[in-house]
Structure formats: C-alpha cells, structure tokens
Swiss-Prot record:
<feature type="region of interest" description="Disordered">
    <location>
        <begin position="50"/>
        <end position="351"/>
    </location>
</feature>
<feature type="compositionally biased region" description="Low complexity">
    <location>
        <begin position="96"/>
        <end position="107"/>
    </location>
</feature>
<dbReference type="InterPro" id="IPR036925">
    <property type="entry name" value="TIF_IF2_dom3_sf"/>
</dbReference>
<keyword id="KW-0963">Cytoplasm</keyword>
<feature type="binding site">
    <location>
        <begin position="507"/>
        <end position="511"/>
    </location>
    <ligand>
        <name>GTP</name>
    </ligand>
</feature>
<feature type="compositionally biased region" description="Pro residues">
    <location>
        <begin position="64"/>
        <end position="95"/>
    </location>
</feature>
<feature type="region of interest" description="G5">
    <location>
        <begin position="597"/>
        <end position="599"/>
    </location>
</feature>
<dbReference type="InterPro" id="IPR044145">
    <property type="entry name" value="IF2_II"/>
</dbReference>
<dbReference type="Pfam" id="PF04760">
    <property type="entry name" value="IF2_N"/>
</dbReference>
<dbReference type="InterPro" id="IPR053905">
    <property type="entry name" value="EF-G-like_DII"/>
</dbReference>
<feature type="compositionally biased region" description="Basic residues">
    <location>
        <begin position="324"/>
        <end position="333"/>
    </location>
</feature>
<dbReference type="InterPro" id="IPR023115">
    <property type="entry name" value="TIF_IF2_dom3"/>
</dbReference>
<dbReference type="Pfam" id="PF00009">
    <property type="entry name" value="GTP_EFTU"/>
</dbReference>
<feature type="binding site">
    <location>
        <begin position="561"/>
        <end position="564"/>
    </location>
    <ligand>
        <name>GTP</name>
    </ligand>
</feature>
<dbReference type="InterPro" id="IPR000178">
    <property type="entry name" value="TF_IF2_bacterial-like"/>
</dbReference>
<dbReference type="GO" id="GO:0003743">
    <property type="term" value="F:translation initiation factor activity"/>
</dbReference>
<feature type="binding site">
    <location>
        <begin position="457"/>
        <end position="464"/>
    </location>
    <ligand>
        <name>GTP</name>
    </ligand>
</feature>
Length: 956
C-alpha cells in the first residue's frame, strides 16, 4: 500500500495538520512536516486514536446525515441461503447495516447521538469476542451507529483517499438494501464511516449489501469459524496484505459464480453471492439483475470464475481482485527487451560497430569529434573511456593509441588521418584540389624551370666563399662582390650550350633549414652541392651533410674546394667519399666531382655546368606558370619597420603583388615583393625566390604557401591549420620512441628497426661502439641501423636527424648544450649518455631483447661558465664562474666540459662561495667561486655542469 502524507490524512480526518503532528509525537512517531509521509501501521494507529481522543467531534460534520443525497432504496434481496453455500465472489464488510424495515432506507437524523453512546461500550464484549486475540491498540475502535446509514450514502470528495480502490467514484453494484431478519446488535468490529482508509470507498454503503460485525444468518456469529475457511477475525493482517483495486463487475452484469478458496462461496442464480467475510463480516448479497456481491473479509476469496486458494486481496473487508499494477506477461517483457539497446561498459548506451566499420578522425581529435562521427553522446564515451583506464574530458585532445583502444572496445576501426590527407581535406573544403590541378595539366601547359640547388658542407671548407664566387658570376645582377641583402636564396644566370640558363641557390648554413624542410616534407631541393676541402678531406660535418642529402634522395655534385692550396689532395677526397657510396665518374661511378677554387674563382663555370648537366640528365624540371602560385617558405623573420618578412620559393604558378596568400598558419595580402638584391618585383615565376611583405605573422621554415581566392578564405584556412596543429601538439604526449617504447613496440610487432645516432669524444671510441653494436646477435626479426655517427658534442643537427628518422641518440663522453637539450626535450628525442662502452652495448642489447630493467635518471641542475681560474696552494684551483642556467648547489655531482667534450666526470662541488661567503647554492645570473676538490684541470671557457642521479621506474 502506498504511503500517505500528513496533510492529506489531516484533511481526511477534518483536523488541521498541527493536530495530527502533535498526535504523532504522542504516539512516538516523530515527523518533520505536514508534507512527510507515514507508514500504513502508523496511519491505522492514528485513525484508531483520533476518535477515542476527540470523541468524534472532529468527524461529526462529515458524518452528518444528508437526506438530499440519500441513495435509492435497494430492492429486496432473496432469502439468505445457508452459509456453507456462499459464492466465490467476496463480500466486503461495509458500514453497519440498518436493521429497520426494508421500506425505510433513510432514517431520521435525530437518533445517531443516543444510539452511539449506547453502542460504544458493547462493541468489544458482545460482538467481537475474538478481538481478544489481537494485539492491543492505542484505543478501542468506535462502533458505528445504525441510524447513521443515511449519512454513509454521501459521495466522498474525489482524490482525498489514496487507499481507496476507486478515487472519488461510488462502487458499482447498487447500494446496500435493508437486511432481513430484524435488528442486530451493533459491534465494534466495523470501522467508522469515512475513517477507514482500507475500505473500498469512503463514507458510503458497499455495493450489493453490507456485512457487519453482527451474527451472520444461518451462522453462529462473528466469533465462530467461517464456513469454508479456518481463519477467524482475531489476527490483524500486515500492511503488506493491502489489496489493489476491486475486481467487481459493472452494474447490471451477472456475476460469475465459482468455487473460491478459504472464505469464498459459490455464486447463486442470477446474482452471485459475495465471499464470506473475515473479522465477523457477514456475506454480502448480490442484487437482482446480476449485481456482484460484496468482497470477502481477511481471508478473501479468489477472483470470480476462478478456483484455487483465496488471495490476500480481500484484507480488511476489501474485495479481492487483480492489483492496480498488473504484472507484465512474458511476451510483453520480451518485446521490451528486444527494443532496448544493449548497454555498454558502465551501463551507458552507445552505438556499436560491427568490427569492420572504419571511422576516420584527424590528429589531436577530441571525444566530441569522435562522438559526432558515430552519432553518440560524448558523455557516454567519457564513461566508456574511464572504464578502460583512461581519464579524459569531452574537449580534450587524445592521441591515436587512445582512440584505437576506444574503437576496439566499441567495434570500430580507427583510421588517423595523415597530415597530408588532413591538408588535402582542409583545402578540399574550400574547393581547392592541388592533385586535380596537377592532373589536369597537359604537356603544353608545362614549361622548363630552373633547378633549385642547395650548397652544403663543412663550415671551414669554403662554402660561403664559394657562394660568393657563384654570386659574382651573375652578370644580370650587374654587381660583383658580396651579397647586398642576403635572404637565404638567390638566382643566377649562366650560359650553357649557347643558352641563358637560370639556377636558383639556397643558402642553408649549417644545413639546419634543409633538415627542417625535409622533416616537414618540403623537399624543394633538386640538387645538392657537397663542398669538401682538398686539404682537410672528409670531415664529420661533411658526412652529416651527406647523410641528409642521401636521406632526401637528392642527386649530389661534389665540389672539391681549395685545390690551389698547398697540400691539397683531390684524389684523397674521391677515395674517402667512395666509402659513403659516392663513386666518382673517374672510378666508374655516376657522381660528378669538380675541382674548384673559390678564392681564385677557378672551376666555377665547370661547377655550374655540372649542375645543369645533372639536372638535365636525372631530373625533369617543368612547371606550369599560368595558374595561381604554389610554393614553400624558405625562411622568415620579423622586421621592425616592415613587419613579417617571408622568403618564399615559387614551385608552380605565378605570384603577383596583390594576391591573397596563406603560408602555414600565416596569411595576408602581398603588399610588395623583392629579389635578393632588394629590387622590387611585380611577379615571380616557378623556381624564383622572393621576399614577401604583408603577412600577419611569421611562417615557419618549410611551410607551404598558396594563393587563396580572397582574404576571407585565406584567413579561414590559416585558422583551421592553427587549430589542427594546436590539437595535434596537445595530443602528441612525447610519442617519439625511446628504448622502453621500442621494447613494447617490438613485442607488439610494430617496429622491426632501431635507428641510432652515435656521437663520441674520439673517433676510436665511436668506431668501437659502432662495431660492437652491429655485431649484436638479436635475430633476423630485428634490424639495428646506425644512421649517423660522428665525433664531437651533440648538436642541433643530430637532434633534427633523430627527429626525422625516429632515432635514439647515444652520446659517449659528450653532452649537448642547453639549447640542443631543450630542442631534444621539445621534439621528444631520447638521448642516452654513457661513459663506459659496455653499458651502452648492454642497454641496446637488452632493449632489443626486451629485458630492460629499472634505470637511474640524471636530472640536470645547472651550468656555470668558467671566467677565470684562481690558483690557491691550500684549496687548489678555484673556478671563478658565472651561472648560465639553473643553479649550482654545493655537494651536487658535477662534470667539466671543454668544447662539448667531457674532460672531468664523477666530480662534486666541494666548495661554493659568493663574495667571500660560503653559500649552499647560487642561482642563474650570479657569479661565484667553485671548487672541485682535487680536480685542477680548469681553463677559461670550460663549462661546469651539475646534476643529480635519481632512480626511475621503467614503464611496464
């Protein structure tokens, strides 16, 4: 049975809520407010205690007789058959029945008061002897008066009683008529009219007759056993036995007879008899015309027309029947189950794939983007990801591994869009298709373009002087000597086979821009000139430049410089380069070697001719100038007077002043163009390097540029590129490979080659380390590749090369400077430092075999540069230093570097002073005196590096 609120019960009892709350407190039930709910036993106790305390004053008004609303007299009922033949239709025990003549259903309103006073003391002893077996209640139940029958015929206010079987409507089956057999003594077993919450209807007679607590016809009274059942009216049912809505028939319909269980009877002819009532309730009588009989008592009968045990639906005089909420059939439950979606992890419902559904997402996408692809709720994906061990927000950028795990759980195949495809889709959204443009071009549209040449080599081998010598041959420029305005790229004209040919040169000192462009996929170089000094031969940076060019698959022309210098040996250079797969034509190879002297200007024409011959023989250099310009940014800088200045190389089309361009994340309109001499240009054809003014920001080296239809389109493309790069950066999470990552990837079959970059302090150590690593027996499944080795400190070029080829840098007694270390940390390149060759070999071998153990991590504290060395007979040499980065802490481990080579290791800061005061640490920018104990090999310019060694758990 449902709970009832205090204010509803107060309105039903005719008192205010405060009175009910006070009564509840007296009964030991502490309720907070009038809106609180109370249980059914408490309601019953409250109803029993209220009439006893108030003497019916509170309920006198509702019980007042209303002759105007009196029901019609019920027709005479047939003589009552023996009790043993009671029908299965249960008869509810209603209000006390009037025992007057049948023709007087409405009695005078005067008798209720005196008869009530006379009947109250007789109820427990005379009519309810079986009530002694019931547990004691707070107060005796008041006996209903016989003269109040007319008052019971009023209709209750709709919706007031939550326990009534029919809210606000009279029960069908007609009103109870006068009972034959004369008056019967009143009993206390019947509830007070309008106060019983368990009656089928409040304040009105029960349909089909009423059962009272008096003796039943043909029986021995309420105290005796009921026919057909063994229950007696002594034990009160529990609140869980409260019934639902009565299952009586509609008025005028014949009641179906049937054999009931305990307390039930069988139906009579024409109109079924009600079931025998518990608690002394007399069986109801069916009215003529098939009106159903009243419901049964405590042991109420089963539903009419159905045999079997009597249910608990007839508790407290309520007719037995089907509950209000019918139980669903198996078919209905099955249909609901089939219509439901199968819940995913955590009880959330998300669309699931069939294991082959491909979902393409961009780099750095968020859960919201993935939810849009599969039409799911992003919050549900957060829950699924949480159960997979990953915590992420809806808008957080995720890496590819997280999306793959999520897709595998939901039945989707995740495909991460490559940067090239992402760029293609981005431009396609603006109706720009570069591939379609290239495919639509015919041979008639293509014209020859100048080759783009990059000059590389050792910085001391005359590369800059060679560029100046080539620059001086530019007769069109009309100047001889140095470069007026060096922009990193320029174009010269030479005469080749009686034709004027142009050659574009890119100046990449340190070949940093070349590596950056190759890392971003901007391979704009057609030919590389490798400059080697004839006296020095092949140097470490020469090999480094050679590795860069070979990795980019660029034809190489070797320029042997300084041939006029004493001790020059060009043949030695050709022999040395043969070891690096550069075989000269004189030795039967295909690489052109040209002897030049940049100082004297000899061999320059032969070098340019060799470049043009290589371009004509090995390359097809053609482009379409009759379209919008496409190209790449070579370099850019921010000028105070002119703003962002970008040097761009046009690869196809023609760039004109006034075009709207977008270069990477920068965009703008071309306000002016200049050549390498500072002259204004109105247009730039393919392979022409120019300086462009008018961009909103500075593009990066290697960013591609194109001409957009208008400024608005250029701005939108730049904004979308910026958003995509920012999301990809957030999702990157240092995904560069390390030794631990390689071990895990090797177990999953994702990596079969380990790339290494070896750097050492001496060539012998590097060669020994390389030979030992290449001799490792790790099986045929794994390949160890050393892409570069050299002597000297770890440089920015080493980091760039490792970034491109996803390699690991191994430093043997060498360290990077602060700028290179920051670059490696930013790019996620793993750099390992060793001082014992066997430790390096063991780590690499264990990585290949998947047997890495926990390691110790070295954390750099700071560096200091030695400005002056003070010699002391007592303390040894003291390094007067200035802290360049971090801090210098007394007692910390230290090493001494000279020209990026470790000359002293396993040292410690023995003493630290500042202005003659002993201090524990000195921070960045301050000067101090540093003592390294017994180590005295200090010189001006040395770098003292301090660090801590911490134990680091390897990723499992």
């Amino acid at each position: 049975m449902a709970k009832v609120r205090v204010h509803e019960l107060a309105r039903e009892l005719g008192v205010d809520s405060k009175t009910v709350l006070a009564k509840l407190n007296e009964l030991g039930e502490f309720v907070k407010s009038a809106s609180s709910t109370i249980e059914a036993p408490v309601v019953r106790r409250l109803r029993e205690s209220f009439p006893a305390d108030s003497g019916g004053a509170a309920n006198g008004a509702p019980a007042a007789p209303k002759p105007a609303r009196a029901p019609k007299p019920a027709p005479k009922a047939a003589p009552a058959p023996p009790v043993e033949e009671a029908p299965a239709e249960p008869a509810p025990p209603a209000a006390p029945e009037v025992v007057a003549a049948p023709e007087a259903p409405v009695a005078a309103p005067e008798p209720p008061a005196p008869s009530r006073e006379a009947e109250v003391p007789e109820a427990p002893a005379a009519e309810r002897p079986a009530a002694q077996a019931r547990p004691a209640t707070p107060g005796p139940r008041p006996a209903p008066r016989a003269a109040e029958k007319p008052a019971d015929t009023r209709t209750p206010r709709p919706g007031n009683n939550p326990f009534a079987s029919s809210q606000g409507m009279p029960r069908p089956g007609g009103q109870g008529g006068p009972r034959p057999g004369g008056p019967r003594p009143s009993g206390g077993g019947g509830p007070r009219p309008g106060n019983n919450p368990f009656a089928p209807s409040q304040g009105m007679p029960r349909p089909g007759g009423s059962g009272a607590a008096g003796p039943r016809p043909g029986g021995t009274g309420a105290a005796g056993p009921r026919p057909g059942g063994s229950g007696q009216g002594g034990s009160r049912p529990s609140p869980g036995m409260m019934p639902g809505r009565s299952a009586v028939g509609r008025p005028g319909a014949p009641a179906r007879g049937g054999s009931g269980g305990p307390g039930g009877g069988r139906g009579g002819p024409g109109g079924g008899r009600g079931g025998g009532g518990g608690f002394g309730g007399a069986p109801g009588r069916g009215g003529p015309g098939g009106a159903p009989g009243g419901g049964g008592g405590f042991s109420g009968g089963g539903r009419s027309g159905r045999g079997g045990r009597g249910g608990t639906q007839g508790a407290f005089g309520r007719a037995g029947g089907k509950p209000v909420r019918a139980r669903k059939s198996r078919r209905a439950k099955r249909q609901e189950f089939e219509q439901m979606s199968a819940p995913s992890i955590g009880g959330v419902q998300v669309p699931r794939g069939d294991g082959t559904t491909v979902v393409r997402i961009r780099r750095g996408a968020s859960l919201s983007d993935f939810a849009d692809r599969i039409d799911a709720n992003p919050a549900s994906l957060v829950t699924v990801l949480f159960h997979l061990g990953e915590m992420a927000t809806v808008t957080q950028a995720l890496d590819a591994g997280t999306f793959e795990a999520l897709g595998a759980e939901l039945g989707y195949v995740i495909e991460i869009v490559s940067p090239e495809d992402e760029e293609r889709e981005l431009l396609g959204s603006f109706d720009i298709d570069l591939d379609a443009e290239a495919a639509a071009e015919s041979d008639e549209d293509l014209e020859a373009r100048p080759p783009v040449v990059t000059v590389m080599g050792h910085v001391d081998h005359g590369k800059t002087r060679l560029l100046d010598a080539i620059r001086s041959t530019d007769v069109v420029a009309g100047e001889a000597g140095g470069i007026t305005q060096h922009i990193g790229a320029y174009q010269v004209h030479v005469t080749h086979e009686d034709a004027d040919r142009a050659v574009t040169f890119l100046d990449t000192p340190g070949h940093e821009a070349f590596t950056a462009m190759r890392a971003r996929g901007a391979d704009v170089t057609d030919i590389a000139i490798l400059v080697v000094a004839a006296d020095d031969g092949v140097m470490p940076q020469t090999i480094e430049a050679l590795n860069h060019a070979q990795a980019a698959n660029v034809p190489i022309v070797v320029a042997v410089n300084k041939v006029d210098k004493e001790g020059a040996n060009p043949d030695k250079v050709m022999q040395q380069l043969t070891e690096y797969n550069l075989v000269a034509e004189a030795y039967g190879g295909d690489t052109m070697f040209v002897n030049v002297s940049a100082k004297n200007g000899t061999g320059i024409d032969e070098l340019l001719e060799a470049v043009l011959l290589t371009a004509d023989a090995a390359l097809d250099l053609r482009a379409n100038p009759n379209k919008d310009a496409r190209g790449v940014a070579i370099e850019a800088n921010l000028d105070k007077g002119r703003g962002a200045v970008a040097t761009v190389l046009v690869q196809s089309g023609t760039l004109t002043v006034g075009d709207s361009i977008v270069a990477g994340t920068a965009y703008g309109r071309v306000r002016a163009m200049f050549d390498e001499n500072g002259d204004n240009l109105s247009e730039a054809t393919p392979s022409r390097p120019v300086q462009v003014l008018g961009l909103t920001s500075v593009p990066r080296a290697g960013d591609s540029f194109l001409v957009a239809p208008d400024d608005r389109t250029a701005r939108q493309i730049a904004d979308k590129r910026d958003a995509a790069e920012r999301a990809a950066t957030l999702a990157k999470r240092r995904k560069r490979i390390s030794l631990e990552d390689f071990t895990q990837a090797l177990e999953q079959g994702k990596v079969s080659t380990l790339n290494l970059v070896l750097k050492g302090d001496v060539s012998g150590a590097v060669e020994a380390l390389e030979d030992a690593l290449l001799q490792l027996d790790v099986g045929a499944e794994v390949d160890l590749r050393i892409i570069h080795r050299g002597v000297g400190g770890i440089t920015q070029n080493d980091v760039n090369l490792a970034t491109v080829d996803n390699a690991i840098i191994i430093g043997f007694n060498v360290r990077p400077d602060v700028r290179v270390a920051e670059l490696a940390d930013r790019e996620g390149v793993d750099i390992r430092y060793y001082s014992v060759i066997y430790a390096a070999i063991e780590d690499v071998e264990n990585s290949l075999k998947g047997m890495l153990k926990p390691e110790f991590e070295e954390v750099q504290l700071g560096t200091a540069e030695v400005l002056q060395v003070f010699r002391s007979s007592k303390f040894g040499n003291i390094a007067g230093s200035r802290v360049r980065s971090g801090l210098i802490r007394r007692g910390a481990s230290a090493r001494v570097l000279r020209d990026s080579v470790v000359i002293g290791d396993n040292l410690s800061i023995g003493s630290l002073r500042r202005e003659k005061d002993d201090v524990t640490e000195v921070r960045d920018g301050f000067e101090c005196g540093i003592g390294l104990g017994s180590f005295n090999d200090l010189r001006e310019g040395d770098v003292i590096e301090t660090f801590e060694v911490r134990e680091k758990e390897r990723a499992s």
